[in-house]
Amino acid sequence: LGQKTISLIIFIFIAKGIFSQAGCTDPLAVNFDASAIENDGSCFYETTAYTLGFVSDLSSDLLSENSGLSLINESLWTINDSGNNTMIYELDSSGNITREVFVQGVNNVDWEALTQNSTHLFIGDFGNNAGSRQDLSIIKINKSELLNNSIDTVLGQTLFFKYGDQFDFSGPTNAHNYDCEAFIATADSLSLFSKNWQNQEVRKYTIPCQWEGEYVATFSESFNVGGLITDAAFDPISNQIALLGYNDLGTGIYSSFIWLLWDYNSGNIFNGNKRRIEIGSMFTLGQTEGICLRPSSMSGYVSSEQISSVITIPPRLFVFNFEEFVSNSTVISQEAQGEAYIYCYPNPFHSRVYIRNFKGRIDLYDALGGSLIYQGDYLNQGVDFSGISSGVYFLKAGHSIFQMIKN
């Protein structure tokens, strides 16, 4: 790494701590500010449409009302919503049921969502269309029991909660802001995302992963999503979040969307980048109810439940990859390549790294020792760095330098 480059990197790291100019730091945003060092959450993006990859119709009658989706060790897990039994279904990547597990000691009032951390799977029994429920709960299951293929029954623990700011339980049905179908888990807390029928926003409530009695969920922040949120997914490696939802186009016809959230300050997920992806209509997708992410990736699965009205649309499974829409590179220095700024993704990465809007020589340096790890020409096919050790690196593409993290 040349002396000028090292000096530049040192200077910018110092400047980050002293001057920290705030602005939109995402090169993909309409209002990208190349001089900004600190992301202030102001980025906005052009309207983005994406066609999900169709995997299969979920042909089993057991999955017609599936709601919620989680990915554990390459297996998908799903549940059914209100009025159904207390079963969890394991699916393969084609959507076929490979295992049925009975959750003992719990009820299914209105199961709506699944999430997980490293030790437990959580079921959200918090569907509340009428706004009148006073028995909202989270069901907690030990993952080590669930993943024991020799058993078909696991014990569930029911944890009750209420919203700290709800005092009126009269509804009316589908016209209030205290429904919920989405949540995510970290090591020690759960974040619930409301389904606001009344104002089309989402409110985030925080509760711990374990408590006694009835816990009072604390409101922490809100965001205008322009629709109804039906599920959420979280990747603990990259801290990326996806919110699945739909908006009514009138006369009962609706289209689905996914909000991508990343590069936010811990605890305040709506103060970072927020990008909406339009994914299609109910006639193609069905009623989208489940989403999950692959580890360290903005790719994953979406599931839908059956629509039975004037027409019947079966439950379905889809795949997506939104890596091209998310820039996680920490920019050390950058210049435009023609009219477009370049960026690297994914970041953090496990193996292959891609560079958008760039062709030419790239150099990868160890951030600690400054030693050259890789040098070669980039020709749009991605570079495989799976053989290098985990750590922090500097990737130099032309005159642009990015800080990259290898997991």
Task: Report residues per predicted region.
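Primarily marks secretory-pathway-exposed extracellular/lumenal segments that are disulfide-
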Residues: 4-46, 329-334
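Conserved beta-strand positions that form and line the central face of beta-propeller blades
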Residues: 23, 28, 35, 42, ...
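Disulfide-stabilized cysteine-rich extracellular repeat microdomains
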Residues: 29, 34-37, 41, 237, ...
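Short, acidic, Ser/Thr-enriched surface-loop or helix-capping motifs
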Residues: 26, 33, 92, 366-367
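C-terminal outer-membrane/trafficking sorting elements
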Residues: 334-407
